Amino acid sequence: LKRNLREMSFPYVESSDTFTIRATGDWYISDAPDSREWTNAYGWVHVDRLSGKGDPGTYQKVTVTCDQNTSEERSATIYLHGCGEENVAIAIRQDNGIFEWKPFDNGQQFDVSGMLKLNAEAGAKLRIPYIKALGTEKYTVTVTQTGGDGITAASGSYSISTAGNGYIEVPLTGTATKQGIVTFAVKATDEAGAEKDFGSVSTIVRAGFDAQGEELPLLTQNFGKFPWGGDCIGQKAGVTTADKTVANLSLDNETVSVSAGTNASIGGITSTVRNGNPSFYRAIGMEGWTGYLNYMCPGYMQFGAAGDNADGQPGNIISPVLNIPAGYDMLLTFKVGIWAAAPDQGMVGICEKNDGFWISKGTLSKIVASTKSYVSLDIPAYTWVEVSAVIPNPGSLANPSLFISTADSWFSGSTVKAGRWYVDDIKLVY
């Protein structure tokens, strides 16, 4: 008496799978040991046949079906008997099926999907993600709002009508009458009166568009001219220049293979390369950018290093000088990734342009404090995750620039702790 599986795993939803039996004679299936009877002991496990007569050259198929699970992960065991053998076990496991509110990979428990534009009808919505719904859930959603004059979030009753994963979507209606930051705070109460607080999310009402409605970003950088390095996030090998002499760097250089997890190994981009080969720096789309402890990867940038930096320099990048319209707030979006030991968070904001940051008593010099905020790096490894931050207008400032840096929470005295993270697709809008 042979079976092709010793264990079977099922998702939380009602689902079926098969195993095969090869036997020399009569066989039986039970749901209790030392018995050839099916007693429906578990109630949620079903088989499409309980017995059969086999021959050594024939594989007989049995289908196992598990009902939808609405509780914790559960397990069962079924037993095969016959042909001189008893209690030949097959273990069955089914995933947890309890309804969950499921945050986005960036840690937000809800988001603002769509754009809010000044003097235009709102077409955006708040999305609250969930998984493992039965399709019978009902919630009262309450939204409180700061800013966003003219826009209203539709607090009220919401029903989930389809089983599985999805979103509760709260429409935003009205016409925004003022550019600037808008913050939404969301709570939901179920039919039993239990309340869930989803925290708050901020975005901006945007005004930066031309006469045709096309957006006018203050800044973009996608590192699309970075050709070299192993792909740390995609876990793929790559190439880098065979000649790593800084003065000889050229996009026409011959290349050699490098493994995944290895950057281009040509030195710091905004330090060594910028100072040693200005023409190559322009060729890779970095003119006007400064910073420290950052490195080339294929199509994106690495911040930080594998070892502590005793000079107190965090991995960072500083944009060219920005032309920020007076009085307008901004929204920064970019992608982050991690693959090994990484800082706990990144730090962003507006600073006065300089060639790099130097730590002084645990802070970074020349930052406009009112613009500084943090983005979490508590994210899945090997995955690009979009993060965002609202940046209040910095007011009158000489040479305002955007900075993205390893956060000051990663400093230890005058040392920046070891840790690497990766940045791509930077965009700043207003």
Stretches found by the model and what they are:
Residues 257-326:
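Surface-exposed, low-complexity/disordered Ser/Thr/Gly/Pro/Asn-rich loops and linkers
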Residues 134-136, 310, 325-328, 337-345, ...:
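Extended, low-complexity, turn-rich repeat/linker tracts enriched in Gly/Pro/Ser/Thr and Asp/Glu
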Residues 24-63, 136-162, 167:
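Surface-exposed binding patches on compact interaction domains or structured appendages
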Residues 314, 323-333, 397-399:
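Extended extracellular/luminal ectodomain segments enriched in beta-structured repeat modules
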Residues 208-276:
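Extracellular carbohydrate-recognition regions
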Residues 2-34, 102-141, 224, 228:
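Solvent-exposed, low-complexity, repeat-rich "mucin-like" stalks and linkers
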Residues 62-64, 72-84, 180-191:
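A short beta-strand micro-motif common to beta-rich folds, especially ectodomain repeats
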Residues 358-430:
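Terminal, low-complexity interaction segments
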